[in-house]
Structures are given as C-alpha cells and as structure tokens.
C-alpha cells in the first residue's frame, strides 16, 4: 500500500502544447481511465482572469466543464491559479463557484513573491479548499533565494501541500535530497515534488522523493507537459506495480495511452538537445519551447543560442556592416516553385538587364543561379547557412552573405568559405519585430543595395483553402512584410512571376523579353 499520493496533471501541463484545448472524447477516456488507476488527484487546468492570449477550455476551466468532470470522476480534483496574475479580490469570481466541485486549489508561485502568495493562500484556504503551494525554480532556491526556505513556517496550518517544482528539469537526486532536508527543517506541511524531464531524471528524482518520504508526486500521461515534459504516468505506475505491488490495470493504462497517442504524434513533446542544455543551465522551459516549436529556427541555431546564453555572450560572432552599393534593379528570390518553372526566362531577363543584383531570401534555389555573373547576396537566417552549404559549393560561391543586425537571438552561423565576404545590416528599417525573418532581411538588403526597381520571384503563395499551421503563419508574416514595404516606399513590391499574394503587383517577366 502506497503512503504517498499521486497527482496526474496531464490536462493542465499538457495544455501548453494544445493551448488547453482537448477533444471531449479524449477527456472522457482520460477520466474513465483515471477512475480505474491508483491516481489520487486530477489537475484539470487553470482558472484565469481574461487574457489577450488564447487559452482553451482547460485554460479557464468553466464551471460547467468542471461539473461534468465531477459527475463522472471518482478522484479528487484540483485546478491551478497563477499567483502573479491573481489577487485576493479575484477569488470570488475565480474559485468561489468551485466550492463543492473541486477539492484542492494549487497556486503556482515565484519564490520572490512568497510573502504576497501567503496572503492569497490564506484567502483561498478560508473558502474551504485544500491548498497546494506550488513553488517554482527549485534548482535556484539555495543560490538566488537564500532567505526563501526560512519563510516556509508561514504556511504551517495554511497549506495542505508544499510542492517543490523543478521548473528547469535539471535537478539531480543529490540536489533534491539536500533541498528536501532544508524544507523539512522549516515547515511541517506535507511535501510534494513536480519534476520535468529535460535531463531524463523525472523518474529517478520522483523515486528519490518517494524514498525520502515525500507525501505527493506528480506525473502526466505519456509525459505530456511543457517543454521536455514530465514523468510519464504509465512509467511511474509500472515501476510501482513491479516494485511495491501496487495494483495497476494495464489494459486501462494502455487505453489511456492510446487516447493520447495522436496528440503525441502531432506535438512530439519530450526532451531533446535544446531542452537538455536548458535543463542543465536553468534556462526557462517557456523560452526554449517557443524556439523549438518555431518554424524558422534550426536545431543547430537553437543549440548555439543557448550556448551563447550559457557563456554570457550576446552573440558568437560580429561582422562588418553591409556597404550600400546601388543597383538599378534588384531581384529577390524566394522559395516557391516559380524560379524553377521559369528559370530560363528569369536568366534571360537578368542577362538583358543592366545594373542588377540577386538577393536570395532562401538558398533553396541558389544553386540554379551560380552561373549568372551578377552580384549575389545570400540572406542567412535560421537554417539558411546550412542550406547554402548544401546548395552552393565553395568553388561555386562568389557572393556576399548578409546577416540580421547584431546581436542575433540564436547566434550566428556562416559557411567557412564565406567568412571573408559576410556582412550584417545595421538595422531593419522598413518593419519591426521580424528580425528572424528571411523575407524581412531580404527586403531590407534589397533596399540597402538598390536604387530603382525591386522585384521578387518565388513568392507564389500557397494554393488551396486549407493550409497547415506553418503555411498560415508564413503567409501572414509575408503579407505583413509586403504591406510594410509598401508603406515604407509608397509603392507595391513587383513580382515577375504569378503570385497569390494580393500585396504584390504582378508584372509578367515575359513582357520584358
């Protein structure tokens, strides 16, 4: 018989991937499975004041949703509040309607706000709920918050749980043991542990917590959770069944895994090198997750940016400012299929046009133009340095590489053969907020080196009415940049090939031949 309680936080922590939207069938399958498994509490999501950012059903946990789950669940239920965005005067709206529906309110707390959090906790406790005090940034407590642990006696008689949160996923069993001893010296409140899996230590840290006699541990189905995720519920239960004889219905456990597998296949949470680096160096999961899920950033660039941060440097390289040569005609080459389809005509146009330069927003088609004897400018953002190396060999390279302004968020990568002919722009003048955009860098480069016509090819747009999330994001970004160009110059950008972007003015290349 286990002498500790298990929180399953799948819907709350997993919501960081789904924006807290879960299909009703998945939730019902989850609740039914949890009813048959040795789980004590289900953490269903957040209660929040209205925010500008979208949060789905389990980001707000409407009362009607909680009532439905209360009716079908045999487990204790809890929801979480963020202390930083919750004041005592909000509680009548946020949690008073939950009396008799949920059993515990857990509050996410930054140690620096401990005193303020105690006031909030007392107000919550007075409403009759069990209270969980979830304190973040555990790996920094002894270094960054030296007085924090000494204050824990203030929650005696208030909190029913003091949960230690390894926010960065970098704790070791030895460090965990040290902190548990310090915590127990300072409070009589039952202690819990919520781990993250950046260094694949979620299981061993949780087992260490159990061996140390902690009262609560957290887990999630398939480890679903922010960034690198959490300890897998199925892994913990399998171990406890084998080692402690805790009864587990593995058919039910398999069913809930099956229910969440499509979400895993879609979002692919779990640790990988960027999360490992962030865990080992206590870098916030939120920041790394935003990088890993961003279409523009290569794996190498994320690792490089994290390494720069670890080394406390702004960027790993700095280059001279791009000189503003002035060409009468500049052609920006994008990544669509039209440069391939109209290659001969584009080359003919270039050959008959005087004072012309090519700016490659992406190196995808760069190899097609190495035989054209005009200046080439290659924009290097994200994965483009690697793409350039793949498409243009050292013996064929005759151009200039262009980088965004210094310092670059994720560091700098330049092909070895281009080191001597690499420059950076001083600033992004025609738009704001797109420092990591290939198209933004290409347009600014064209403005810097051109004095007349600026054309594009390869900005075809995506056909069809149903676009992927990546295509929608890229389309919206590109539209914004074309509109910003028009505001900056007073005229639309001209496309020499057909395009679905209404922000472009199409002038068929064939009229010039």
Where are each of the predicted segments found?
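Catalytic cores and adjacent flexible loops of soluble metabolic enzymes
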Residues: 1-328
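Metal-ion/cofactor- or nucleotide/acyl-coenzyme-handling active-site neighborhoods
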Residues: 321-359, 365-513
């Amino acid at each position: 018989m286990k002498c500790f309680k298990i929180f399953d936080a799948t819907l709350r922590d997993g919501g960081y991937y789904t924006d807290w939207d879960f299909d009703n069938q998945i939730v019902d399958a989850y609740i039914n499975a949890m009813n048959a498994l040795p789980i004590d509490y289900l953490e269903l999501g957040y209660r929040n004041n209205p925010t500008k950012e979208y949060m789905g059903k389990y980001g707000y946990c409407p009362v009607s949703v909680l009532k439905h789950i209360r009716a079908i669940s045999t487990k204790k239920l809890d929801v979480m509040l963020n202390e930083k965005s919750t004041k005592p005067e909000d509680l009548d709206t946020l949690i008073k309607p939950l009396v008799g529906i949920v059993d515990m309110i857990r509050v996410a707390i930054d140690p620096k706000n401990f005193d303020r959090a105690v006031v909030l906790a007392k107000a919550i406790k007075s409403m009759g709920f069990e209270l969980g005090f979830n304190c973040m940034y555990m790996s920094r407590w002894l270094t960054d918050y030296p007085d924090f642990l000494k204050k824990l006696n203030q929650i005696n008689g208030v909190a029913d749980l003091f949960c230690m949160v390894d926010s960065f996923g970098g704790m070791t069993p030895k460090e965990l043991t040290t902190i548990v001893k310090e915590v127990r010296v300072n409070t009589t409140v039952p202690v819990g542990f919520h781990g993250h899996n950046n260094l694949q230590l979620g299981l061993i840290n949780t087992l260490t917590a159990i061996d140390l006699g902690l009262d609560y541990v957290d887990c999630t189905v398939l480890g679903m959770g922010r960034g690198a995720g959490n300890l897998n519920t199925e892994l913990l239960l399998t171990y406890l069944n084998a080692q402690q004889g805790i009864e587990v219905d593995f058919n039910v456990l398999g069913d809930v895994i099956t229910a969440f597998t499509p979400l895993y296949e879609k979002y692919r949470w779990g640790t990988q090198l960027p999360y490992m680096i962030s865990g080992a160096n206590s870098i916030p999961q939120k920041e790394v997750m935003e990088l890993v899920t961003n279409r523009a950033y290569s794996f190498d660039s994320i690792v490089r940016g994290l390494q720069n941060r670890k080394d406390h440097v702004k960027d790993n390289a700095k280059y001279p400012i791009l000189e503003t040569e002035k060409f009468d005609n500049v052609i920006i080459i994008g990544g669509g299929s039209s440069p391939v389809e109209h290659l001969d005509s584009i080359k003919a146009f270039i050959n008959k046009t005087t004072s012309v330069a090519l700016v490659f927003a992406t190196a995808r088609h760069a190899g097609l133009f190495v035989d054209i004897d005009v200046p080439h400018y290659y924009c290097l953002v994200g994965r483009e340095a690697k793409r350039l190396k793949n498409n243009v060999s050292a013996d064929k390279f005759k151009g200039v590489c262009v980088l965004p302004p210094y310092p670059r968020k994720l560091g700098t990568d330049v092909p070895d053969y281009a080191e001597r002919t690499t420059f950076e722009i001083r600033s992004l003048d025609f738009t704001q907020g797109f420092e990591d955009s290939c198209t933004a860098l290409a347009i600014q480069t064209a403005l810097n080196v051109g004095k007349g016509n600026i054309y594009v090819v390869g900005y075809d747009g995506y056909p069809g009415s149903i676009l992927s999330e990546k295509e929608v994001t890229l389309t919206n970004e590109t539209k914004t940049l074309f509109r910003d160009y028009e505001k900056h110059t007073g005229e639309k950008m001209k496309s020499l090939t057909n395009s679905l972007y209404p922000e472009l003015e199409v002038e068929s290349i064939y009229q010039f031949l």
